[in-house]
Amino acid sequence: MPVNIKXFNYNDPINNDDIIMMEPFNDPGPGTYYKAFRIIDRIWIVPERFTYGFQPDQFNASTGVFSKDVYEYYDPTYLKTDAEKDKFLKTMIKLFNRINSKPSGQRLLDMIVDAIPYLGNASTPPDKFAANVANVSINKKIIQPGAEDQIKGLMTNLIIFGPGPVLSDNFTDSMIMNGHSPISEGFGARMMIRFCPSCLNVFNNVQENKDTSIFSRRAYFADPALTLMHELIHVLHGLYGIKISNLPITPNTKEFFMQHSDPVQAEELYTFGGHDPSVISPSTDMNIYNKALQNFQDIANRLNIVSSAQGSGIDISLYKQIYKNKYDFVEDPNGKYSVDKDKFDKLYKALMFGFTETNLAGEYGIKTRYSYFSEYLPPIKTEKLLDNTIYTQNEGFNIASKNLKTEFNGQNKAVNKEAYEEISLEHLVIYRIAMCKPVMYKNTGKSEQCIIVNNEDLFFIANKDSFSKDLAKAETIAYNTQNNTIENNFSIDQLILDNDLSSGIDLPNENTEPFTNFDDIDIPVYIKQSALKKIFVDGDSLFEYLHAQTFPSNIENLQLTNSLNDALRNNNKVYTFFSTNLVEKANTVVGASLFVNWVKGVIDDFTSESTQKSTIDKVSDVSIIIPYIGPALNVGNETAKENFKNAFEIGGAAILMEFIPELIVPIVGFFTLESYVGNKGHIIMTISNALKKRDQKWTDMYGLIVSQWLSTVNTQFYTIKERMYNALNNQSQAIEKIIEDQYNRYSEEDKMNINIDFNDIDFKLNQSINLAINNIDDFINQCSISYLMNRMIPLAVKKLKDFDDNLKRDLLEYIDTNELYLLDEVNILKSKVNRHLKDSIPFDLSLYTKDTILIQVFNNYISNISSNAILSLSYRGGRLIDSSGYGATMNVGSDVIFNDIGNGQFKLNNSENSNITAHQSKFVVYDSMFDNFSINFWVRTPKYNNNDIQTYLQNEYTIISCIKNDSGWKVSIKGNRIIWTLIDVNAKSKSIFFEYSIKDNISDYINKWFSITITNDRLGNANIYINGSLKKSEKILNLDRINSSNDIDFKLINCTDTTKFVWIKDFNIFGRELNATEVSSLYWIQSSTNTLKDFWGNPLRYDTQYYLFNQGMQNIYIKYFSKASMGETAPRTNFNNAAINYQNLYLGLRFIIKKASNSRNINNDNIVREGDYIYLNIDNISDESYRVYVLVNSKEIQTQLFLAPINDDPTFYDVLQIKKYYEKTTYNCQILCEKDTKTFGLFGIGKFVKDYGYVWDTYDNYFCISQWYLRRISENINKLRLGCNWQFIPVDEGWTE
C-alpha cells in the first residue's frame, strides 16, 4: 500500500509536530536549529547544506578536491535563500511521490519507516533500553508563543539534508560513537542522507553486444528518484545494522566502457546489484552474512535481558515486540527471543539482494548504469523537476506522450536537451596530473613540456594488500562443517508480495528526553588535496604519443608527420603511426579538379591501414595481431615499436603491459580433521566435508587469481584498447581537418564544381574505425586471456595440487586411524578420496565474472586449445576444412549436401558418393592401449517409416568410422540407439549405447539436433554424453591395443533403407579424455548463440512457414475461430501402435515471421535473432494474409490476440519482439508486445472474458497475451513449462506424417 506523504511549503509555520526546529548532529555551534519537515512518519527533510565534518572553505572549488576519480560540482551559493529551500523541499516531496507510485518503492519506504533503530548501542548496558543516544534521537526546539522554548528529544529513522560541499556527491551515513558503528553492529541508527536533486550524474550507454558500434554509445543522465532510492537502500541497511563499513573490494573487471577501477566498498556493490556483487568472493560473502547473523543473535540476547529504560515513556514490552517483528525473531513459550536461521536468511536476502538499484530501475523503467564501475561524464543540472512537462511522477523524464520513452530517450542528453543545462567549467573540478619532461626549445627557451592527464586515464593497478588472505588460513573440518556459499537471488516480486517482510506495527511515540552527550560522537575529518599534481618523467609515454595526435581547434594548414617530436613542437603537425605513403598523400596539395579523387585515395588508405591485421605463427592462442599498436601508443621499447609483430611473437602478451604485476598465489592453508572416536557417521561426514571444502579451495583460489588478473592485468589491456580508440579517433579527426583545409583553399567557383558529401566522409572514417576497433578487441581480449591461462592459472594449479597431495595423505591416514570403527567402509572411503583428488578442477571463467565478451574469448580458448582438438571440421568459404591446426585434408563425395548456416552442417545420403574422408596427420594417430581420446559431434536423424518399423529397429548402420586392419572405432545407429564401438587388434569389441524412446508424444531426439560426446579412458571407462549430460558408462579396461586409421570416414554403411540420411555438424576429436565439466562447457559453447532456433534446432528464419508449438500445453494446436477473430485450441492427433507413438505436428494455423520496420536486425541474412522486432503473419486462414494484433486500449491483465487481415487500424498494434528469457539452452522463445509506456505481456494460452454488450462470454485455452507470464518467468519454478514458451515448426523432410 502507498505510504502517506505530506506536502509542505518552506514558509509554512512551525507547529512543533511535523514542522519543527531541529538541532542537527552536524551542529556548527550552540543554539543552531534548522527548519525540518516530516514528510513521512520518522522521515524528515532539512533544506540546508550538510556541514557535518566539513570546514567552511571546503565548499569552494578553489580549495582542491576530495576525490581523485570523479567530477566534483561546487556552488557555495546553493540552498541559501528561502526560495531555493522551498524548491528543494517540494522537489524532494515529488521524488518521494514518484518512489511511492510503484509497489516496490512503497515496500521500500514502508520497511524504512518500520525499521526503528534499537534503543541503545554498544555502550548501552545490555539490560537497558536508551532512547536519548545519538544513534536513536535528535533534539528539537518546542516553540510556544508567550512561553519559554523547550528542548525535547525526537526519535527518527532518517533525516535528509541538502548536499555537502560537492553537489554531485550524494551520500548516506550515520554516527560513529566511541569507535563503534551501530549501523554495522545490528543495532541500526538514525540515518542521514546528503542529497542534491538538481544535480544529475551522467553516464555512458553500455551495450553488452560486442558488435555494437562504439559510436552508438550515448550519454544518459540519471533519474534523481533512482539516485535517491539507491541512498534509501543504504538507509535500510543501516537501520537494520547490516550496512557494510570499510570493506573495499577489488573491482570485478575493467571493461572498455569502465572508468574508475579503484577498490569499491562492498556496500556499494550489494546496493547497486546486477552482476556487481559477483566480484565479492564466496568466503567474503559468507563472512558478511555470518557477521549479520551474529549481530542479530546478539540483539536477541539483549532483548532477553532488557528490564529497564533510560528515558521517560519507554514501553519496554512494546519495543520488544517492535524488535521481534523488525528482526523476525522467534519467541519460545518462556518469552525468550532467538534467530530462526530460515527467517533470517529470507530477511537478509530481501535486504541485500532484493532492494538493489538495478532491480528498482527495471521496475520504474529507468535507464541506469550497467555497472557501478561504469564511466561517469561531467554532471549536469536541472531546475525543471517540478515542471510536469519535463519530469512526471509516474514516468520521470521518459514521457511517452513526448515520444521520450523509447530507448529511454527522456534521459538521453542528445535528445532531451530541454530538461537540463550544462554546469559552467568554473564550478567543475577534476583531479589532474601534469606529466612533464625536460625539453629546450630554440625559440622560446622553455625548459619543460607538460601533458595534462586525467587521473582515471592512468593505468590502474590494484594494491596487492586489497586481495583476500583467506586461502592461507588453516581450517578445522568437522562432521557439520558447511560450505561458504550464499544464494544471492531475491526477486523484486518477492519483496512486493511477501507479507512476512511487512511488520504491520503501530509506531510508538517518537518523543523522548533531549540528547546531551555530544562527546560520544566521533566527528569525521575530511581532507582536500590539490586538483593538479605535477610529476616529471624521463622519456615519452603513451600520453605524449596521444597528445601529439591532437591539434588546436583553430589551427590551419594541418599536416601529418611520422615524427613524434615534430608533432609535439608544432601545433600544425599531427603525429601518425600509419605509413609514410599515407602521410605524403594527405599532405599533398591538389587542385580542385583532383580534390574528389584525392579525398577518396586518402580515405581508402586510412581504411586499408587502420583495418590491417596479421596472423601469428609462434603464439598459438592469439590468432591475430594489430601491428600499429606499438608505434601508436609507444608500446614496448624502441626496437619493439618498430617491429611490433616480431617483438610480440618473442615476448608474448606481456610486452603490451606497462607494469608486470606481482602475483599473489598463497600456499593453501591445511585442514585439521576433527577426531570422533567410535562415531562412524561423524567420521564419514568429516571426510565428505573435507572433500567439499577442498573443492571450495580450488574455487576460491581461481577467484583470487581472476580478481588479480582483472584488476592488475586485464585493466591494462582494456586501457590500451580505450587508448587505441582515442588514437584512431585522433587520426580520423586530423584527416577530416586536412580535407576541410584543402577544400577551404579553393575559390567559391571551384567549390561549386566539387560534388562531395562531407557527412559521407565522416561516416566512412567512423566505419573504418569501427572495423579497426573490432580487430583490436579480438587481439587485446586474446592477449589478456592468454596471459591469464599461461602466466597465472598454472601457478595456482601447482599450489592447489600440492594442497591436494597433502590432503590426500591426511585423509588416508585419518581413514587408517579410524579403521576399527569404519570396518567395511575403509576401502570404499579410500577409493572415494583417490577418485576425488585424482583430477584437477577445471577452470571456468564464467564462474568469476559476468563479462560476456571475456567469457566468449575464454570459451574459444578452452575449445580451441585446452581441449586439444586434433580434428575439427568446419565449412568455410564453400569448402570443408580442418580448423584444429593439424592440417587434415578432406575428400568430399559428390552427393554430400552442405548447409553453411548453423556451423557447417552436412547431409549424408545412403548412396555411394555421399561420403567424406578426413585424412589426419600421422602425428595424431592413436595406436596404443594407453591413449585416451574423445569425440564430439551433433547429429540429426529423420523419423522412422511408420510402415517398416521393424527394419528401422533391427538394421544397424555405421555413420562415422576409423578402422584399420579391422581394429579401431565407429559410431553407428540402430533404430533409436546411438552406438559407440571400440575394436581391439584381437577382434575383441566393446560397445556402449544411448537409447531414446520412440513412444513419447513429443520426442527430444527424432529429427532434432542433439549433441553426442564420447570420452575414452583406456584404463577406465568409455562414457557417452548427450547434450552435455552423462547417459551411460562402460568399462573398457579389458581391451587390448587398438589400431586407428589415419582416415576418418563419414558414410552410411550397411544401411538397408535407400531413403535414409543423417545430418552432422561440429565434429571434433580431442587428444585426451574430457571430463564432465568440460563436456558440459563444450555443449554450452556450441549451443549458445543470439540466433533463435526452430523446433528441429536449425536457425529460425524470416519469411518461412511455421506451425506453432506451445511448450506448456504440448497436446494442443491453434486454429482460427472466426466468430471472434481469434485463435482457439484443439487437441493434437496421435499416431499410436504397439511399437511407436507420436503426435502430429503439422496442424493448425501457419505463421510467417516478418521483419518489423523498426527491427534492430542489421544483418543481411534472414536469420531471426534474440530481441528482433517482428510481425507475425498467417497465410492459411484465407487467400489474403492475416496478422496477429493486440488491442491498443486493452486494460486487462490477460486478453485475446486478434487475427485479422493486414491493416493499419490505429486501435490495433502489430509490432512484437521475439525474446529468449532463459540462459539454459533451449529452443523455446517468447513473444513480447510493448507500446510506448504500456507492456501488454507475452503470448500464451489462457482464459479471458469478452463483453458483447448484451452478454459475457468466457473463453478458456485460447490464444492470448498476458502480463502474468512476465512475473512468472523471473521465478525458478518449472519455468520451461510455462504457456508463454513457443517453438516454431517448419515442414521438414526428416518428419513425415
Curated annotation (Swiss-Prot):
It catalyses: Limited hydrolysis of proteins of the neuroexocytosis apparatus, synaptobrevins, SNAP25 or syntaxin. No detected action on small molecule substrates. It is an enzyme of class 3 (hydrolase). Disulfide bonds join 436-450. Keywords: Disulfide bond, Host cell membrane, Host cytoplasm, Host cytoplasmic vesicle, Host membrane, Host synapse, Hydrolase, Lipid-binding, Membrane, Metal-binding, Metalloprotease, Neurotoxin, Protease, Secreted, Toxin, Virulence, Zinc. Binds 1 zinc ion per subunit. GO terms for cellular component: extracellular region; host cell cytoplasmic vesicle; host cell cytosol; host cell plasma membrane; host cell presynaptic membrane; membrane. The gene is botG. Residues 488-537 are annotated as: Belt. This is Botulinum neurotoxin type G. Changing residue 1191 to R: Significantly decreased binding of HC to host SYT1 and SYT2 independent of gangliosides. Zn(2+) binds at residues 230, 234, 268.
